[in-house]
Amino acid sequence: MEQTYQYAWIIPFLPLPVPMLIGLGLLLFPTATKSLRRMWAFQSVLLLSIVMIFSMNLSIQQINSSSVYQYVWSWIINNDFSLEFGYLIDPLTSIMSILITTVGIMVLIYSDNYMSHDHGYLRFFAYMSFFSTSMLGLVTSSNLIQIYIFWELVGMCSYLLIGFWFTRPVAAKACQKAFVTNRVGDFGLLLGILGFYWITGSFEFRDLFQIFNNLISNNEVNFLFVTLCAVLLFAGAIAKSAQFPLHVWLPDAMEGPTPISALIHAATMVAAGIFLVARLMPLFIVIPHIMNLISLIGIITVFFGATLALAQKDIKRGLAYSTMSQLGYMMLALGMGSYRSALFHLITHAYSKALLFLGSGSVIHSMETLVGYCPKKSQNMVLMGGLTKHVPITKNSFLLGTLSLCGIPPLACFWSKDEILNDSWLYSPIFAIIAWSTAGLTAFYMCRIYLLTFEGHLNVHFQNYSGKRNTPLYSISLWGKAGSKISNKNLNFRLVTLLKKKKNGRPSFFSNKVYKMDENVRNMIQPFLSIPNFDNTKTYLYPYESDNTMLFPILILILFTLFVGFLGIPFNQDVDILSKWLTPSINLLHQNSNNSIDWYEFCEDAVFSVSIASFGIYIAFFLYKPVYSSFQNLDLINSFVKMGPKRIFSDKIKNAIYDWSYNRGYIDAFYGTFFTAGVRKLAKFTHFFDRRIIDGIPNGVGFMSFFVAEVIKSVGGGRISSYLFFYFSYVSIFLFIYYFLNL
């Protein structure tokens, strides 16, 4: 066992050769590297699979022995400062490692087909492998300095993948938004790290926790300063895990490819913030005010994310706000001190959300054959519906993921979310009411997404179904670059037909006008496509199921969604695998903790939570099931008959909720009005002050010196007669003034 732990340092570095070799290959042998591009995908999956097997071996040993292993190398040593690098293998590390590798492998396999059309295929796999390396390095770090280094690398990889299609302005802006928002949190994290080093004199977790606890017990610290440093550390987690109010980057991050959305939302970037709080829990738990703040931010995010998801029309944005809300549940659990419940929900949510995102990617992939490669169309649930008979495997997998997130037993998220909901009653009745109510909202909006996507009729064929014409549609090239409008005459092959007149004169979603692609782009993608002849025009009237390469990871994630929840079911102490796994960490936080459970109380709470979820599902079916719904704008309430004043009142409520969700709770508008505009005004004032005041004073002095010098120069001409004239003139003026003053 000791030998296995000694080689654990290699875990973060195993996926690293792939991006390095891809970079060298593209630099030195570009043609050969591109021709063998499938080989790089295989190597990425193979190396990450080795890490997964290694992580599973470590986890099994930890479950059996409840051990924690740390090894460090001294990097800098002197009398005043020492810096060590190493790795820490504990239950939190092993859980995160398995989560990262299993989800990462599924996403890599899925991406091989999903990204096959993209000329950035190799770049994508290089980024993904480096992303895995960064996240694995983060979870194995033994001190705050390593945490910060890999924290920044995780952020960098996220920015690269969010802006993967950087030629699209909206993707570039989303990347910038994620970068700027996370800079706020990262700066706070850095200040917090420096603050706690100033207090304790150590970056190592074990030494830091021990020294800090001794200082707290002896009352040798300034609690105000300690709380400030803890808040700064927590700010990093707020930004990275998209917690209120630094959540604004998360929905815009959907501009990246769908596979990376699955990885970010399941096991990497947003999970990093939860991991950081869990890692620093022994530090936070002795500071009551910071624990209250963590739970407060968590419950606000829970409710806020759920309300923003109510009326989203973009399938990926709806899932993004769902992630935000579920991360709020995890943060709430950590703030309440429910360490086990938070990590349990992190595990179950990761597999369920990965399943949902890969399922949405399959839907988007099938819709692109109808509406073109345009995210605003292929991700728009307004144009979906009726996909059940066209993509049955995707539909069933998405349904399972939806029911899991709704909290329906025996699926994964039911067990973990139910623990958090039960613990919330013990912490705060107000928080409990909000958390339980949001569980109903979660069931509502997730069922809404499912119904709009798969039930009813394929709305892409009924463009004027609601009585309103859609805005003009535009083409997006395969690489995400904005294409030309329909009127562009320089296009040269048919991609999809739109707005075609039927025989009865009614407009449908198809037309005789065509989209075409530039010749150079066609030449780039031809070798990578499975279509034998790209010149042959083939228009699909209906979506079709994805290839087996994309379906295989979805089917594996279905198994995880069905069975991973049984890891944490507390039947008894011997069967509760998760509690045995987390024994060292739980004992560190709660000495002599008792994991026994009252099954009668558990079943009573479970019936209540399932009833709330079922009520949310029923409301969604009532409003969005095709037999009732008129699909008028696909808003929240769209099926009530006219009822006079009551209908007017319900319309006001509907419009208010829709505006709240569509405008993202007005947080983005608030930031744009006050922060962005304020920074610009401050910049203009600073520019004016710098140019007119700071530069104006020395420039004015220089100008006056020049003017005086010119006057003196004109006076001093070198003629004695001039000197005598000025001399007698000044004497005369002086005598004249003196005479009049003495009168």
From Swiss-Prot:
Its EC number is 7.1.1.-. One of its GO terms (molecular function) is NADH dehydrogenase (ubiquinone) activity. It is found in: Plastid, Chloroplast thylakoid membrane. The keyword Glycoprotein does not apply. The keyword NAD applies. InterPro entries: NADH_UbQ_OxRdtase_chlpt_su5_C (IPR002128), NADHpl_OxRdtase_5_subgr (IPR018393), ND/Mrp_TM (IPR001750), NU5C-like (IPR003945), Proton_antipo_N (IPR001516). PANTHER family: NADH-UBIQUINONE OXIDOREDUCTASE CHAIN 5 (PTHR42829:SF2). This is NAD(P)H-quinone oxidoreductase subunit 5, chloroplastic. It comes from Ambrosia trifida (Giant ragweed).
